[in-house]
Amino acid sequence: MRLTKYGVFHVKQTSSCDVVVIGAGHAGCEAAAAAARFGARTVLLTQRLETIGEMSCNPAIGGLAKGQLVREIDAMDGLMGRVIDRAGIQFRILNRSKGAAVQGPRAQADRKLYRLAMRAALDETENLSLLEGSAEDLVITDGRVAGVVLADGSTIACGAVVITTGTFLRGLIHLGEKTWPAGRVGDAPSLGLSLALERAGLPLGRLKTGTPARLDGRTIHWDSLDRQEGDDPPVPFSYLTERITTPQVACGITATTPETHAIIRANLERAPMYSGQIQSTGPRYCPSIEDKVVRFADRERHQIFLEPEGLDDHTVYPNGISTSLPEDVQLAMIATIPGLEQCRVIRPGYAIEYDFVDPRALHRSLETKGVGGLFLAGQINGTTGYEEAAGQGLMAGLNAARRCAGSAPLVLDRADAYLGVMIDDLVSLGTSEPYRMFTSRAEYRLLLRADNADSRLTPKGREAGCVDSERWAAFMVKAAGLERGRALLQSLKGSPDWLRRQGLEINRDGVVRSAWDLLAYPELGLQALAAVWPELDSLSGAVAEQLEIEGRYAGYLDRQEADIRAYRREEGLALSADLDYDAIGSLSNEVRQKLKAARPETLAAAARIPGVTPAAVTALLGHVKKMVLDWAEGPVP
């Protein structure tokens, strides 16, 4: 066992710190860095230091809604955006032809570069130490976590623990009829922590995920395949990255065939998901290829993206054919795919089952309701995806550090960020399948865009203590540019006749319009307006992009701001954790049971529980208001 910066822990020795983070995947790295940025003495515990920041499944960051999460993590001074900017080998803005609210940045990553860049970022973080070892138990005293017991018998005393174990909790790999315990291929599972969580009274369940085979790119017939190039120039994730310097590569595109599907159908009884070997639920929106063939029986082809895993790595990730079929079936199946007829399989795909905690057992701070100082983040909360995990990790790590300092947690709501939407969904509704983020989950997505995440969150992060001076200074420069740009756009005005003489087709209604007003016209952007007012050429880069979006959607944004004010009135009405729902006579038994199970923290959270009717919300509101009134009036003398 090694501990950087603190020296070496000896067996049976007890050491101490403020926050211990268990697991160094995407959630753990962000949790540890956030706690350390706040100033907490933090230890990041992992079985193997060389796997810190490992991309266990696909070699990509971002995507629809996920890209917004990465921008939000970056706005809070998290690591993921800067790390992918250093390791990305293909950048694309998805849904570029659609509105700004549903666009999403995505990047292919060089796995090794990503891992090295994450390790370097952690090594540069003050107050953070990296420890190689395995957590086996928790020390819980008087309902509060007090330390972590390691496999060698040593103990780390601490004020808070963040568990970010991914798929390691009682992980079980399935490859056809074969099964073996593992956290992922090559790593042992975590058994003791599952038992510790059960002893602490946390409700555990099982979920499943999977990954495809890995291919040798030197044996792929690339010339016969379509190519997918990245954007040129590539758009960075981090607000601090000026430009991408890593060499860029293309991906290949192919598809399954009827012959592929015939092989899969002929071997379904050997597929763990269909033989009854796997009982857990997998991710609905990332199904295995055997699931696709069964659920979409009329489809003759399913698209596959062949994604290089690195600049100096011949491994290719075939995105779209995740499977746990036996290895011989996988080999036969892959040989029927165009371009892969002679392809060598480096490693077969597999499925993995693992424990998770029902996230309804958490506060919105991601602290468990039953054990003070114990925080959970990532797949342990029922989510899937690097970005979802990283976002939870940042919030859990920051709030763990704030708890140690005696400060109130930072809680983001549904109008603040996709981070707030995700956490609210989890703790209010729970999940019976791996949860992933979508733009459709966010009611206020027009405001929760990728371009303005810093405007929304960097001031909150600065106030909460997780944004450093370098990022704050850069943010203030951009904020000043936005303020000057808005003032300039609103100051430049013209009548319809004058604007028509400048070549702009405007209704002759006599209304004088500003350049800001004209941005609402779909055909008019800053470039067109700069031909009329050359001083607008001074606006460029991220400032120009954000101003153009704000101007275009100004009317819609105003209406959404009004919706948010109404939402926050409900969100501001807190519900007591010991509220007696049996005392509200007008509630049905079904609604009463749902409210008791979820114990929502606010009226708005109660309204989002499936089956809780508007009438029930009204009854709940009336009951709470009566309680407040009775309390204010006090006993009659």
Swiss-Prot record:
What subcellular locations does the record give?
A: Cytoplasm
UniProt binding sites for FAD: G23, A24, G25, H26, A27, G28
Name the species this protein comes from: Paramagnetospirillum magneticum (strain ATCC 700264 / AMB-1) (Magnetospirillum magneticum)
Query: What cofactor is needed?
Result: FAD
Q: Which HAMAP family does this UniProt record tie to the protein?
A: MnmG_GidA (MF_00129)
* Superkingdom as given in the UniProt entry: Bacteria
Q: Name one GO cellular component term.
A: cytosol
Q: Which GO terms describe its biological process?
A: tRNA methylation; tRNA wobble uridine modification
Read off the InterPro entries from this record. Answer: FAD/NAD-bd_sf, GIDA_C_N, MnmG, MnmG-rel, MnmG-rel_CS, MnmG_C, MnmG_C_subdom, MnmG_C_subdom_sf
Q: What is its main location?
A: cytoplasm
Q: Which family does it belong to?
A: Belongs to the MnmG family.
Q: Cite the SMART domains for this sequence.
A: GIDA_assoc_3
Q: What does this protein do?
A: NAD-binding protein involved in the addition of a carboxymethylaminomethyl (cmnm) group at the wobble position (U34) of certain tRNAs, forming tRNA-cmnm(5)s(2)U34.
Q: Which residues bind NAD(+)?
A: 282-296
Q: Which GO terms describe its molecular function?
A: flavin adenine dinucleotide binding
Cited Pfam families: GIDA, GIDA_C_1st, SAM_GIDA_C
Q: Which Gene3D superfamilies match?
A: FAD/NAD(P)-binding domain, GidA associated domain, C-terminal subdomain, tRNA uridine 5-carboxymethylaminomethyl modification enzyme MnmG/GidA
Keywords for this protein? Cytoplasm, FAD, Flavoprotein, NAD, tRNA processing
Q: What is this protein called?
A: tRNA uridine 5-carboxymethylaminomethyl modification enzyme MnmG
Assembly and interactions? Homodimer. Heterotetramer of two MnmE and two MnmG subunits.
